[in-house]
A protein has these predicted regions:
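C-terminal substrate-binding subdomain of Rossmann-fold SDR/epimerase-dehydratase oxidoreductases
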Residues: 104-242
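Catalytic helix-loop patch of NAD(P)-dependent Rossmann-fold dehydrogenases
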Residues: 2-10, 17, 21-22, 31-83, ...
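Residue(s) in the substrate-gating loop at a strand-loop-helix junction
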Residues: 28
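Feature marks short, surface-exposed loop/turn motifs that line or immediately flank catalytic pockets
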Residues: 32, 85, 169-171
């Protein structure tokens, strides 16, 4: 809450002092909560996020929406991204979480590089094709491109502009494991564990609005996400130096 909510309030204060009125917020698909239909469309009402992270993102969306109502000359973009993965293709920058990773791709990468023995897959009895959870994975470079396009297209265009940034297709946990095994050239050890409370069986984006209005769409595949992650992790087996 301090990072997302208080940090945003401090940034808004600084922007008002500098007379800057274009704001791009990196929001999250978690603001949708549990929806009855997939894919998720921007017109869906926001739900009840399960995590403090999602709740803080929704709070910031509400703050920015109220700000724009009070000061209609502001241009605010709410970019709801789905599951960012991958790394910079140079292999110089990647995700290096401390402790056991919460996100799937770095967890797989640490198993593949030998830092962890096995990947825990939470649930193999979901109503999906292979029984594992399905998510919409997007390469971080596509996500970065989306922010740049939003900055260029929406600058000085008053209003609150909401866009999903996702691939528009779902991939299961085992799909991601198989893509990574192909990227690193060896099997990735995994085991099944009980479902985690609050995890949804499946969801993915309808990103057609971003395609239509921003001329943005993903260009990188799940295989490329795995390849770039492995490139980073294999060059930095222990992550970034302390």
């Amino acid at each position: 809450y301090d990072n997302n909510v208080n940090g945003t309030l401090r940034l808004i204060s600084a922007m008002r002092a500098a007379n800057v009125k274009n704001f791009i917020f990196s929001s999250s698909a978690t603001v949708y909560g549990d929806q009855p239909k997939i894919p998720y469309v921007e017109s869906f009402p926001t739900g009840t996020p399960q995590s403090p992270y999602g709740k803080s993102k929704l709070m910031v969306e509400q703050i920015l929406t109220d700000l724009q109502k009070a000061q209609p000359d502001w241009s605010i973009a709410l970019l709801r991204y789905f599951n960012p993965v991958g790394a910079h293709p140079s292999g110089d920058m990647g995700e290096d979480p401390q402790g056991i990773p919460n996100n799937l791709m770095p967890y797989i990468a640490q198993v593949a590089v030998g830092r962890r023995d096995s990947l825990a897959i939470f649930g193999n009895d979901y109503p999906t094709e292979d029984g594992t959870g399905v998510r919409d994975y997007i390469h971080v470079m596509d996500l970065a491109d989306g922010h740049v396009v939003a900055m260029e297209k929406l600058a000085n265009k008053p209003g609150v502009h909401i866009y999903n940034l996702g691939a528009g297709v779902g991939s299961s946990v085992l799909d991601v494991v198989n893509a990574f095994s192909k990227a690193c050239g060896k099997p990735v050890n995994y085991h099944f564990a009980p479902r985690r409370e609050g995890d949804l069986p499946a969801y993915w984006a309808d990103a057609s609005k971003a395609d239509r209005e921003l001329n943005w769409r993903v260009t990188r595949t799940l295989d490329e996400m795995a390849q770039d992650t492995w490139h980073w992790q294999s060059r930095h087996p222990q992550g970034y130096p302390d």
